Design a protein with these regions (language model features):
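Short aromatic/basic micro-patch
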Residues: 35, 121, 214
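Conserved core of the sugar-phosphate nucleotidyltransferase
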Residues: 124-227
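Short, positively charged and aromatic/hydrophobic N-terminal segments
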Residues: 14-15
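N-terminal glycine-rich phosphate-binding loop and ensuing alpha1 helix
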Residues: 19-69
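Short, high-confidence coil segments that cap the C-terminus of an alpha-helix
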Residues: 63, 109, 137-140
């Protein structure tokens, strides 16, 4: 998994007392998935997908609490019967981040990690990598992670979100389209797919966004209050 990259920093440096900030992982999980209804409860190795995510999040150092935020009593029941913590949230959220923001209103934590409920194989080290820059610098308001892509099919897949960063690891662009665009290689080979097959080294240009986010509470609350883009 690639290094974490930062997406938001305070405009000005603010001195903070050195304190141990509370870290909570919130796992948004929606039952009525359009592509695969009931996905969080699908069994993998005899256990529900959501419980695999929960247990992996619980193994991350510095995480004091793990909470599933869902819109369905069935998911709440499964998590609680397994010994975990779950909260019922609104069924009208437009995104997992909105669900996380609602759940965060009921927890005491300065740093909140949003770990997707359909990532049963996520490594605890990846979550820790996303937490690291936020824990290290009080001026960092948000962080996320990316990983290298391994095939032309992945680069061309619109269901895979790509990211371009600067040299310091700050995100510049996110897109479902292939970014960056190797213009000269495409011109030479006729298409991006042909270029990627002819020059496998081009794959090193592409990184997949993992969908994992870490927020400071203040930014998450601001985000939840912003109106949606009308475009």
């Amino acid at each position: 998994m690639g290094p974490s990259f930062l997406t938001r920093r305070r405009a000005s440096s603010i001195l903070h007392d050195v304190v141990r900030e509370r870290v909570v992982v919130i796992i948004p999980a929606r039952y009525a998935s359009q592509r695969l209804p009931g996905k969080p409860l699908l069994e993998i190795g005899g256990r529900p997908m959501i419980w695999h995510v929960y247990e992996r999040a619980r193994r991350v150092p510095r995480v004091e609490r793990v909470l599933v935020a869902t819109d369905d009593e069935r998911i709440v029941d499964v998590v609680r019967r397994a010994g975990g913590e779950a909260m019922l949230t609104s069924s009208h959220h437009r995104s997992g981040t909105e669900r996380v923001a609602e759940a965060a209103m009921h927890v005491e934590a300065e740093i909140i990690a949003n770990v997707q409920g359909d990532e049963p194989f996520i490594e605890p080290a990846v979550i820790a990598a996303a937490l690291e820059p936020v824990l290290a610098d009080p001026n960092i308001l948000m962080a996320t992670t990316s990983e290298p892509m391994e095939s032309a099919q992945e680069v061309l897949n619109p269901n895979v979100v790509k990211v371009v960063t600067d040299r310091e690891g700050f995100a510049l662009y996110f897109s479902r389209q292939p970014i960056p665009w190797p213009r000269e290689a495409v011109r030479q080979w006729g298409s991006l797919e042909a270029a990627l097959r002819a020059e496998p080294s081009l794959l090193r240009l592409y990184r997949r966004h993992t969908g994992l986010y870490v927020y400071r509470r203040e930014l998450l609350q601001q985000w939840a209050a912003w109106p949606p883009d009308a475009s």
